[in-house]
Regions:
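Conserved SGNH/GDSL esterase-like catalytic core that processes O-acyl groups on lipids
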Residues: 168-169, 176, 183, 201, ...
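N-terminal membrane topogenic signal
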Residues: 9-26
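Generic structural signal for small/hydrophobic residues in well-ordered secondary structure
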Residues: 205, 246, 262, 390, ...
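Serine-dependent acyl-ester chemistry module
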Residues: 4, 26-49, 94, 268-422, ...
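Membrane-embedded alpha-helical segments of integral membrane proteins
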Residues: 22-77
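Internal/C-terminal transmembrane anchor helices
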Residues: 85-111
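Membrane/wall-proximal cationic-aromatic binding patches
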Residues: 114-226, 334-357, 361-363, 416, ...
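Histidine-centered active-site loop/cap adjacent to the catalytic His
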Residues: 2-7, 15, 449-482
Length: 482
């Protein structure tokens, strides 16, 4: 009787064994997911140092060790004597069904919640990678075709990448462009008419252009009101520009105006735009089908453009994968694993697997030509080249650092990259951070979520002009005295 009871006990699968089998199966699934993520982010040809320190390699090693341990536990209990084999197999099958059910629910939920935008798939604010290049390129091509059919506000330029078209007016009526392509009070105004002996030229990005405010509220216009009568401020700013394009804009478009003073004003993100070779990777709010010049330094430290003539947009957007795009490796914002790859097509079909590989996007900043050291060196060289070019043309240069919202969130002793570069290069400059700190921060920037969010408010534009006014007058006075 006792013997029969012992046999029946052995045939029954204890709860602890069931839990152990389930945990082993779940552990194998989790380690399999980790291995997938690690392999997906693995670099093609890493150096030995990159291989040993690579997060993807470390993740793969941990995943393989986890798989071995979980497999060992599973085999031990499956081959054990406790309980019937059928019950042990049943525990495995139920665990697998749970995994499939969770994966299926996750897949369905992600597909329901996902929203397609011009730059990829989003679930809320979460970017579901990879970006499908063909879909992305088709959206860019559509905008390109529409722009060629009409009279677009922003037009392609073979040298600068893009410029504001002359004699334009924005759809919302906020911006009007002169006959020469500069921001002006009225559309088609001829700014060259009636220029006096005092001219101040501005080159910069959308913060210089005055994004989000009327012409009369831009700091360029307000600065003009603070200068002696007859002194004109000419706004050559263009949204999305990097330091490289500002330099080229001066060299090509500003010199013929023979300015007395040339202000190059920039924010920190402009430094990273310098390290891009494609405008469509810089601007992520909407489709932006423009190319961009890319400088690199030669062995003597001289900046040279590597992608002139600029590639044709029509040809770029016909390529099957972004990895085939010429000069893409020179673009800091290009991450190989952010984009679809043919060998991983089965991952791209599943939103759940895409979610797993998007949870922690690994950095690829160690690529040649896009490191932080390269960024500092290229921008420093271009800023020096700008100063030298302005002096050579007989004018006075003025470098101005414009703070953006991040500058007010960081605490001392943090120094923005732009100021680091200016200080290390020993370039004379004006830092307007303390100028804007006199006001309360909410007055500085247009709230995010609103049109032109993150740019200067009219109060901030007024503050910039008020701080620059005396400095500009002083520099103009020095130039006249010389």
């Amino acid at each position: 009787m006792t013997k029969l009871t012992d046999n029946s006990i052995r045939r029954e699968l204890s709860p602890n064994v069931t839990v152990a089998i389930s945990m082993a199966v779940y552990g194998m699934a989790m380690c399999g997911g980790m291995l997938l993520i690690g392999l997906y982010h693995y670099r093609d040809k890493p150096s030995l140092g990159q291989f040993l320190l690579s997060p993807s390699v470390i993740l793969c090693v941990v995943a393989v060790l986890g798989l071995l341990v979980a497999s060992g536990v599973l085999v031990r209990f499956l081959c054990g004597s406790q309980g019937r084999k059928r019950d042990r197999r049943y525990a495995v099958i139920m665990s697998l069904l749970v995994i499939v059910l969770v994966g299926g629910i996750g897949e369905a939920a992600l597909r329901i919640a996902a929203v397609e935008k011009h730059n990829g798939t989003f679930v809320g604010n979460f970017h579901l990678l990879p970006i499908q290049w063909r879909e992305f390129a088709d959206r860019q091509r559509t905008l390109l075709a529409l722009s060629k059919a009409g009279k677009p506000f922003t037009v392609a330029d073979d040298t600068l990448g893009w410029i504001i078209g002359p004699n334009r007016k924005s759809e919302d009526g906020l911006y009007e462009i002169s006959a020469e392509g500069l921001r002006s009070a009225t559309q088609g105004e001829v700014l060259r008419n009636g220029l006096g002996d005092c001219r101040v030229a501005l080159v910069g990005d959308s913060f210089t252009w005055g994004d989000g405010v009327r012409f009369e509220d831009s700091w360029a216009y307000r600065l003009e009101q603070l200068l002696p009568k007859g002194c004109r401020v000419l706004n050559f700013g263009v949204g999305g520009y990097g330091i490289d394009q500002m330099y080229l804009r001066y060299k090509r478009d500003v010199t013929s105006w023979k300015p007395n003073l040339v202000i190059l004003s920039f924010i920190d993100p402009d430094l990273h735009r310098t390290m891009s070779s494609y405008g469509f990777l810089i601007v992520n709010q909407n489709a932006f089908p423009f190319m961009k010049p890319r400088f690199v330094l030669d062995q003597r430290g001289t900046p040279n453009i590597v992608n002139q003539p600029l590639p044709k947009a029509e040809e770029i957007f016909m390529l099957p994968y972004i990895h085939d795009v010429p000069f893409i490796e020179y673009d800091e914002k290009y991450n190989r694993t952010d984009w679809d790859r043919p060998q991983w097509w089965y991952v791209h079909r599943s939103y759940f697997l895409r979610f797993l590989t998007s949870i922690y996007p690994f950095s690829e900043k160690d690529r040649p030509f896009v490191s932080d050291a390269d960024m500092h060196a290229v921008n420093s060289s271009l800023l020096n080249a700008f100063v030298d070019a302005v002096h050579k043309d007989g004018a006075t240069p003025l470098l101005v650092y414009l703070p953006n919202k991040r500058d007010f969130k960081k605490r001392s002793p943090w120094i923005p990259e732009g100021l680091q570069i200016l200080q290390n290069a020993q370039l004379e400059h004006v830092d307007l951070t303390s100028c804007l700190k006199r006001d309360s921060e909410p007055n500085h920037f247009i709230p995010k979520g609103k049109p032109h969010g993150g740019h200067y408010t009219l109060q901030a534009n007024a503050a910039v002009a008020a701080c620059l006014g005396p400095i500009v007058q002083d520099r103009l006075g020095r130039a006249t005295a010389e």
